Amino acid sequence: MENFKHLPEPFRIRVIEPVRRTTRSYREEAILKAGMNPFLLDSEDVFIDLLTDSGTGAVTQEMQAAMLRGDEAYSGSRSYHALANAVKEIFGYEYTIPTHQGRGAEQIYIPVLIKKREQEKGLDRSKMVVFSNYFFDTTQGHSQINGATVRNVYTKEAFDTSVNADFKGDFDLEKLEQGIQEVGAENVPYIVCTITCNSAGGQPVSLANMRAMYEIAKKYDIPVVMDSARFAENAYFIQQREPGYKEWTIEQITYESYKYADALAMSAKKDAMVPMGGLLCFKDKSMEDVYNECRTLCVVQEGFPTYGGLEGGAMERLAVGLRDGMRQDWLAYRINQIEYLVNGLEAIGVVCQQPGGHAAFVDAGKLLPHIPADQFPAQALACELYKVAGIRAVEIGSFLLGRDPKTGKQLPCPAELLRLTIPRATYTQTHMDFIIEAFKQVKENAENIKGLTFTYEPKVLRHFTARLKEV
């Protein structure tokens, strides 16, 4: 099949979920009732749901079959050992704690690493700073509620939608080391490497950059946590783009990548393809004390450490999903689907971030230049897209980034993006064509789209539950 321009989806669809069509007037009323926040829409009112790829896609028949092997023992479950063995085989990590999802892992490891730095290095909580190539929203939120200032150290081209680069998710290594020296290494309890870098547009991090980042971290004795939601997509980009890895398998690249971290926190609802599940894992005995502390917190916050909020069948399914998500043909199809959508949008004059993994990212700032950042152009675009076509998407910009917890001022955002997140094995090329057609209509009316202001604003992670109105 090497000579075909477009290959169909590499799977057969056996089970379907009917969706209903609605009228424009119905959708206008629905988004108004939802406070101009697509998160607050009912799913039955959504025709194409591009809010997230987290737990919203299809599962493989092997994953579904694995559910039947579930051992529901409260402690020492056979299914836990199946999962822990998969982690050791894929990532090379010795210690595994299952969690209900990624934020379950974050609420455990973040306070433990802060406490450890305080006890061993004399961390001053009033000066505490944590670094990342870009923090995912919940990782940022958990860091902030534990008193840390978050600092994203990304490359200058990361958010420039006019520039293409192979690894726009990379750390700016110079800024990272300068930042550590500025605040004092003792005041940096951890560094988070986010793969792929969601907020920059699903952009990958190169192995060379991971290796150099890890060398800096070890120089200052700072633990590195790999935020691993899209580990397989990142490995695919390394294989396709980074010199020297073309002949490596996805499994080999993944194993190599995790040499450059001390722990991993994962929402398994993305590349591991499960509807619910997460992981918190530690590399070796150098992190055994942290692992033991996290096990204790897991009992209080998630469940016994050998189930962590997951039933036995779910752990079996996750063990299979970790492997299924690394299939070469699957990843090629998935990334090509994103490229098809981005190329189609660019062809009608809708500027997008360079195609990355899991989503197309529309540059709302360029499509709606009349709306200032503090009136959330990408959120306004999301509402208009829903009105036009019943498509639910998510803002990745000033609305999501939020305010400085110390000053209360809006944090400056490097780009105002609308994320069109593609659930796995759920939508076909026909759906992509429909999305492109919807944007044609949105673009024709772009100058009439209004900015938004708050009617209700939560203090933390406001984008999930805030309510807004048109200015």
From Swiss-Prot:
Annotated catalysed reactions: L-tryptophan + H2O = indole + pyruvate + NH4(+)
Provenance organism: Pasteurella multocida (strain Pm70)
Pfam family, one: Beta_elim_lyase
HAMAP family with a match to the protein in the record: Tryptophanase
Annotated EC: 4.1.99.1
Keyword Metal-binding in annotation: no
Quaternary structure (record): Homotetramer.
Recorded family membership: Belongs to the beta-eliminating lyase family.
InterPro entries cross-referenced by the UniProt entry: ArAA_b-elim_lyase/Thr_aldolase, Beta-eliminating_lyase, PyrdxlP-dep_Trfase, PyrdxlP-dep_Trfase_major, PyrdxlP-dep_Trfase_small, TNase, Tryptophanase_CS
Sites bearing N6-(pyridoxal phosphate)lysine, chain numbering: K270
Protein name listed in UniProt: Tryptophanase
Cofactor list: pyridoxal 5'-phosphate
Key word tRNA-binding present: no
NCBIfam families from the UniProt entry: PRK13238.1, tnaA_trp_ase
Keywords tagged on the record: Lyase, Pyridoxal phosphate, Tryptophan catabolism
